[in-house]
From Swiss-Prot:
Residues 1-26, 473-513 are cytoplasmic. One of its GO terms (cellular component) is endomembrane system. InterPro entries: MFS_dom (IPR020846), MFS_STP/MST-like_plant (IPR044778), MFS_sugar_transport-like (IPR005828), MFS_trans_sf (IPR036259), STP/PLT_plant (IPR045262), Sugar/inositol_transpt (IPR003663), Sugar_transporter_CS (IPR005829). The keyword Transport applies. GO terms for biological process: L-arabinose transmembrane transport. This is Sugar transport protein 7. Mediates an active uptake of hexoses, probably by sugar/hydrogen symport. It comes from the Eukaryota. Signal peptide: none annotated. It holds the Pfam family Sugar_tr. The chain crosses the membrane at residues 27-47, 84-104, 121-141, 144-164, 171-191, 205-225, 286-306, 324-344, 351-371, 387-407, 427-447, 452-472.
Length: 513
């Protein structure tokens, strides 16, 4: 095996240039199948907003909201302010938050495929319950099962993509999860646009169609190859080598395999990964695992994607026009993700996050000004201003789609060493789902209270996160996943936080006892 110098964590420092291989059809197919999990996540994000704007659904389960919607004197910003309706959307993410804690040990001890299959089965059950719901309890039970699927899928799929992708294309291939998510959102918007014509049962079709990608995810999980990292970590080194040879299209995988073996030896010495991740030497990665998903949600994007039809109806768009406008934003999100895939491994992560953040701030401020000046509680926007609002919301979505959308998942999935990778991904998913739940539950109330100021609220957060990236996030482009820890010791701020190299070995031993 190829040699290399070692740091205190036991992982090779200078072996990356010896990695060989190419992008094989085996890698592409594996990534495509795995990324189906993202499409279901996106479908469930996009479908709820359209369904909750359908009169038949509201009359069946949320009659109070249905009556309020029909009252002309009700404030435009407060028509949909109902905690029960918000709970329909947010329950999905609360269930996902709990299930991701269960998914972490399964992903580590039984492999990434096991969690992908568990997620697919949960999605199947949830979509069936939602489609056949006859009361609110059955409806919420279906949403909870979908949330369990999200917890498993979002925990395993980004890890899977990071671990099968070649180092030089890891950013682009890992973004297939976000691309699949955006395709799922767009598909949900188009489905809602069609099913709202099918009265009174169109909403059932919207909710039930999630079963199709769930079936693909479940079946695909059985046939996917396990990642070589996971196999090596579980002691199946020779099997891991065979998979790595297929993935890289070359027999000369010694250098990359040796990095995995070195990392797995350290990983297997760690008995309590969640305790280990709290060590000072993992502080930079832990901060990123918390801040990146938190900031991703605080861009305000999920509020637009969850409630796009509701939001556009609030602005005076008719039922069909609001669904059409939300479908347009979904299409724009898909296209912008393609831009990110093409640029992320050339321009790097930091450039996309900073420029995307600036663009989002400008768009949100402009939308807030237009709504504040031209849109009142009981008025409607003129056609011209409505078009301008839709354009700037689309530009906001474009900025998110090539920056925080994919990179909010990519960066946390690639920065952790193997011994804390599964725990780190669990924290990332848990934080994402926690803040998604909070925003989903609070958004309709915030919209009623802040009115047009809701866009300024999110613009303020985007300003904070852009400054955070500029000062605290090092560039991870082209850095091998098993050598990522070296970045932090060279960063102007994090090198002050990390313990001395001589203390790292002792710290590692202490946590494994």
């Amino acid at each position: 095996m190829a040699g290399g110098s070692f740091g205190p964590t036991g992982v090779a420092k200078e072996r990356a240039e010896q990695y060989q291989g190419k992008v094989t059809s085996y890698v592409i197919i594996a990534c495509l199948v795995a990324a189906i999990g993202g499409s279901i996540f996106g479908y469930d994000i996009g479908i709820s907003g359209g369904v909750t704007s359908m009169d038949e659904f509201l009359e069946e389960f949320f009659h109070t909201v249905y009556e309020k919607k029909k009252q002309a004197h009700e404030s435009n910003y407060c028509k949909y302010d109902n905690q029960g309706l918000a709970a329909f959307t947010s329950s999905l993410y609360l269930a996902g938050l709990v299930s991701t804690l269960v998914a972490s040990p399964i992903t580590r001890n039984y492999g990434r495929r096991a969690s992908i299959v568990c997620g697919g089965i949960s999605f199947l059950i949830g979509s069936g319950l939602n489609a056949g719901a006859v009361n609110l309890a059955m409806l919420l039970a279906g949403r909870i099962m979908l949330g369990v699927g999200i917890g498993f899928g979002n925990q395993a799929v980004p890890l899977y993509l990071s671990e099968v992708a070649p180092t030089h294309l890891r950013g682009g291939l890992n973004m297939m999860f976000q691309l699949a998510t955006t395709i799922g959102i767009f598909t949900a918007n188009m489905v809602n646009y069609g099913t709202q014509q099918l009265k009174p049962w169109g909403w059932r079709l919207s909710l039930g169609l999630a079963a199709f990608p769930a079936l693909l995810m479940t079946l695909g999980g059985y046939f996917l190859p396990e990642t070589p990292n996971s196999l090596v970590e579980r002691g199946l080194t020779e099997r891991g080598r065979r998979v790595l040879v297929k993935l890289r299209g070359t027999e000369n995988v010694n250098a990359e395999l040796q990095d995995m073996v070195d990392a797995s030896e350290l990983a297997n010495s760690i008995k309590h990964p969640f305790r280990n991740i709290l060590q000072k030497r993992h502080r930079p990665q832990l901060v990123m695992a918390i801040c990146m998903p938190m900031f991703q949600i605080l861009t305000g994007i999920n509020s637009i994607l969850f409630y796009a039809p509701v939001l556009f109806q609030t602005m005076g768009f008719g039922g069909n026009a609001s669904l059409y406008s939300s479908a347009l934003t979904g299409a724009v999100l898909v296209l912008s993700t393609f831009i990110s895939i093409g640029l992320v491994d050339r321009l790097g992560r930091r450039a996309l996050l900073i420029t995307g953040g600036i663009q989002m701030i400008i768009c949100q401020v402009i939308v807030a000004v237009i709504l504040g000046v031209k849109f009142g509680d009981n008025q409607e926007l003129s056609k011209g201003y409505s078009v301008i609002v839709v354009i700037f919301i689309c530009l906001f979505v474009v900025a998110f789609g090539w920056s925080w959308g994919p990179l909010g998942w990519t960066i946390p999935s690639e920065i952790f060493p193997l011994e804390t990778r599964s725990a780190g991904q669990s924290i990332t998913v848990a934080v994402n789902l926690l803040f998604t739940f909070i925003i989903a539950q609070a958004f309709l109330g915030l919209l009623c209270a802040f009115k047009f100021g809701i866009f300024l609220f999110f613009a303020g957060w985007v300003t904070v996160m852009t400054i955070f990236v500029y000062f605290l996030l090092p560039e991870t482009k082209g850095v091998p996943i098993e050598e990522m820890t070296l970045l932090w010791s060279k960063h102007w701020f994090w090198k002050k936080v990390l313990p001395d190299a001589t203390n790292l070995e002792d710290e590692s031993k202490n946590v494994s006892v």
